Curated annotation (Swiss-Prot):
Names of the cofactor(s): Zn(2+)
UniProt organism field: Desulfotalea psychrophila (strain LSv54 / DSM 12343)
Pfam family, one: Ribosomal_S14
Similarity comment: family membership: Belongs to the universal ribosomal protein uS14 family. Zinc-binding uS14 subfamily.
Encoding gene per record: rpsZ
Assembly, per entry: Part of the 30S ribosomal subunit. Contacts proteins S3 and S10.
Function: Binds 16S rRNA, required for the assembly of 30S particles and may also be responsible for determining the conformation of the 16S rRNA at the A site.
Cofactor note: Binds 1 zinc ion per subunit.
UniProt keyword annotations, A-Z: Metal-binding, Ribonucleoprotein, Ribosomal protein, RNA-binding, rRNA-binding, Zinc
Alphabetized InterPro entries for the sequence: Ribosomal_uS14 (IPR001209), Ribosomal_uS14_bact (IPR023053), Ribosomal_uS14_CS (IPR018271), Ribosomal_uS14_sf (IPR043140)
One of the GO biological process terms: translation
Protein name: Small ribosomal subunit protein uS14
Coiled-coil regions, chain positions: none
GO cellular component: cytoplasm; small ribosomal subunit
Positions with a binding annotation for Zn(2+): C24, C27, C40, C43
Length: 61
């Protein structure tokens, strides 16, 4: 888990736009962020398997 201070720091508006980066609002993870859904891959997988993300179906072939 990310430190609370780092999460709080990322939420604030940065002095320069280049310093802003995406962070998962559920767990605070900065990497593997899926822009379309606004969460990280781990939270996405958890929510998709429980059926909480609309329009996502498990593929099978």
């Amino acid at each position: 888990m990310a430190k609370k201070s780092i999460i709080a720091k990322a939420k604030r508006k940065q002095k320069f736009a280049v310093r802003e980066y995406n962070r998962c609002p559920l767990c605070g993870r900065p990497r593997a962020f899926i822009r379309k859904f606004g969460i990280c891959r781990i939270c996405f997988r958890k929510l998709a398997s429980s059926g909480e993300v609309t329009g996502v179906t498990k593929s099978s072939w």
